[in-house]
Structure formats: C-alpha cells, structure tokens
Swiss-Prot record:
GO terms for cellular component: nucleus. Coiled coil: none annotated. The keyword Cell membrane does not apply. PROSITE patterns: ZINC_FINGER_C2H2_2 (PS50157). Signal peptide: none annotated. A zinc finger (C2H2-type) spans 411-439. This is Zinc finger protein 503. It comes from Xenopus tropicalis. Residues 1-49, 97-255, 474-511 are annotated as: Disordered. One of its GO terms (biological process) is hindbrain development. The keyword Lipoprotein does not apply. May function as a transcriptional repressor. Residues 137-157 have a biased composition (Basic and acidic residues).
Amino acid sequence: MSNSPLGSGSRISHFTTESTDRGDERASFSSRAFIHTVPPSDPQRQAGRLPIKVLKMLTARGGHILHPEYLQPLPSTPVSPIELDAKKSPLALLAQTCSQIGKPDPAPSKLSAVTGSSASGDKESKSVPLKLSDIGAEDKSSFKPYSKHPDKKDQSASDKSGFRVPSAACPPFTPRTGSPGSPRTPPPPSEPKASSECTDKKEMEQCAKTAPPDGSAHGRLSTELTHSEGTAGCKSLSAAPSPTPASSSSSSSSVLGSGLVAPVSPYKPGHTVFPLPPASMSYPATLAGAYAGYPPQFLAHGVSLDPSKGSSLVGAQLSTLGCTGKSAASSPLTGASPPSVMTASLCRDPYCLSYHCASQLGAGATCAHDLKSGYPLVYPSHALHGVSPPSLPGHPLYPYGFMLPNDPLPHVCNWVSATGPCDKRFSSSEELLGHLRTHTAFPGATDKLLPGYPSSSSLAAAAMACHMHMPPTGASPGPLTLRSPHHHPLGLSSSRYHPYSKSPLPSGGAPVPMPAATGHYYSPYALYGQRLTTASALGYQ
C-alpha cells in the first residue's frame, strides 16, 4: 500500500517532465516560424522560391494555352524590341496610319515587289515582323481616305455623287451652245446608279448638257436638286477653264465664264425664276445693262438683253426708237440679280404702285421718254386710256408714277380707281395737288388747303406723296386722310401716333366717312388706325 503512492508519484513526475520538454519544443518552433534568423539574401532561401511569372501563369485560367506565334523559332538576326512590337501595339498602328495619310500611292512595281518579298519572307520564317513599308494596300491600318485604289476608282465614281473623278471613258465636255429655253429630258429618277461609261449618243448629249463648269462641290447639289439628272460617269467635272467659252447670250453656263460659281437654283433651268412680261416688250438700256451679266436661263424664251448686239430684241427696238443704250459696265445696276432689281427698292405696300429708283434707271437714256411703252400690269384695259390718253405712258415694268429727271412733266397722278389708274402728268406739284382734289373732294370741303406738304419743292412733294402711299388731297387737313379714321387740324405733326393720348375717334361709333368720288375702290388703311401712319411718315416701308 505504501509503494503505490510512490509509484504513482514517480509516474506523474515523468509526465510533467515530458510535457515541459514538449512545451519548450513548441515555443522554439513558434519562434522559428515568425522570427527568421536567415537573411533574405541566403542562397538556400532564394532557391526555394517560385518566380512571380510562374505563379501568374499557374494561377491564370488560360495560362496553359500557348498561342502558336510564341512557338515559332526566333530569327537568327537580332531584332530590336521596337520592331517586334510595331505590328501589335495599337499606338504603333495609330502612328503608322497617321504617317501614311496624304501620301501618294506607291508605284505598282514597288507594291508588287513589296508583296512578293513579304510573301517569300512569310514562307521562310513567319516570325519576321512587318515594317512600315511592308504593309499592303489591303491592310486596314493603312487606310488612306484621300486616295483611291486603282481597282476601285470606277466603282467609287459611280457610287458617290459628291466626289467625282474624271474617268477616261467619259472625257469632260464643253457646254453645248443652244437656246437657253431648250427643253431637257432627264432620265427617270428610278435608276439610282447609272453606268459609268458614255457609249450611246443620248448619254453623250446628256453629258454635254449636265456637265457644269465648276468644281465638284456643285455636283452633289445639282444631282440632289434635279433628281440625279444625267448619268454618274457623265458628270465628269473639271476645275480647269474650258478651252472654248461660248458667247454670253448663247448658253446659261457659258455666260458665267470659266471658273465662276454657277447658280444652283431649285427651279429647272428651262423655267423662269421670276415672271417677266412677254418677249415683245421693250426694255430701257440700263435695265438691259443690268440684266446682261445674268444668265439668260432665268429670262423668258427668246428674250435677249444684250444692248451691244443689233440682232437682239432690245437692240432692234432701241435702234427703231433712235436711242443708244448705255454699256453694261456703266449701268448703276450692273451685276445685280433680277430678283434684287425687282424688289430691292420697291415699296412693299401693295397699294403703292410707283417705282422709287426711276432716276437711276432713266439717268443713262438720252431719249428716255420714248423708251416708255404702255404695258399695264394690273389693269389690262381701262376707260381713262381710251378717253383721255396720257401724254407719256408708264414704264413697262413699273407703269405708275415713273419719273425721269429730264422729263418735262415729272409729276404723275397715282390715283387708282375702279376703272383703272389715272396716270395724268403735271409740270408742278401745285397742278398735281389741284388735280388730286377732284379725286378726293368731299362735299362742302373743297375750300380747305393742304398744310402738310411744302409747296416750295415740287420734287419733295411728289416724293412724299409717293411714300405716303396716297395721292395728296386738298379736301382733308392732314396728308394721311386715307390712313387715319379722323382728321387733324394741325397737319403732319399732330397725325403722329401718341401712345398715351386718347385717340379722337368719332363719338358714338360713327362710321368712317367714305369719299363719294372714289367709287368702289377705297384704301383699306382707313380702318387700321394711327400705327401705320407713323411708320409711313417716318419712312419705314
């Protein structure tokens, strides 16, 4: 009994010593794991490490797949890494593309030599990189937007309407001389792509008709506006001047001359842009000079406005009248287009039928009173011309109130009634005012005078009468009687528009007094109030 505790005690002490030994080993192992006594430069420690590239290749999913370009043998000649990277780097491809923009195409012999050498090089070793000059024309990186491949020239000329290149199959034509109003027969617009060669006679004629004399910028506009008129190959354009320019009155394109910009009009060239009187009319010399620099495609058929030619219409009429027209260069309206001549200085009031630039038109005519022919625009026939014809009828384009500086009777009555215009002429403004009182005479008001117009200057009175769009009347105290619904005793100064003053309208809603002598024609401006009178009095038209 006494030995048992000793035995047990010795056994326990053995266990304790064994456990303490194991604890020391664990402590020493933990200290070895976290505290390295071997420096990093130790070769044994470095030999146990794996390279980072190998770790990345092992951890990547597709790293075990090797592309065939890495399995090719390296070339024997030393190659710089820039040349190795020139084919694959996007920056290198971009620099290569930018460097080749605008360069001319290499010669075909050089191209064949380059392609042959590159093909043989690919047969020998596929790992040799391509240099900048070795890339063929089919490579996308060497795309040149300003150059055309020799095989694709005909196709691109028929596909694109804006970029036309003169092809050898259809040489550029000189514009054919003919009548300006000759009808055209364009091909149907259902053909989107026409042939690029002009072989038939019809296509040759269409080439001659539709080839404009300027650069390729107007090719697209003309094709869009005329529904692809003419074939695509026939539109061979040339920026060089035409070798034989025609006369100024023969065709529309030759009037403009070589190198000038042709007017692109939405109208067909056979039609007139603005309406003109018939060809039997006579034109003054200055109008003919103004229209001489404009293409006759905008004029009526058979009308020629060249005063220098005796065979033209104007020249024949001027010679019969005994007048010599001015040259085109000395005309004050030379170079102006007909729409601007028609509308630049005209009054925009529909009831004002006078023309304000008459002095410019008539300044160069030696016998201008003979140039005027009666061509009524608004009223074809009225009783006044038959009963008492005026001494001098109006201008052909603007017959009412046409004044000339050397005219002995410069003042014209512009009164228009239901029977037609009056058109009577007077030598002084007083006579004109006295005549106008007969048109606008109210009963019992014939003794009043007109204080608004200055009686000293006859030209100023006539010009004011024209710009007021009304004949000056002696019946009303103010000059703007037809425009204003009331009468002012103070004349022109009180007829202005005052925004803060009450308008002295007739009390009780009385109707506007209608002149008895005017008949069925009365100016509608009497109902408009004072705003129109202010605008016209200040000169705003």
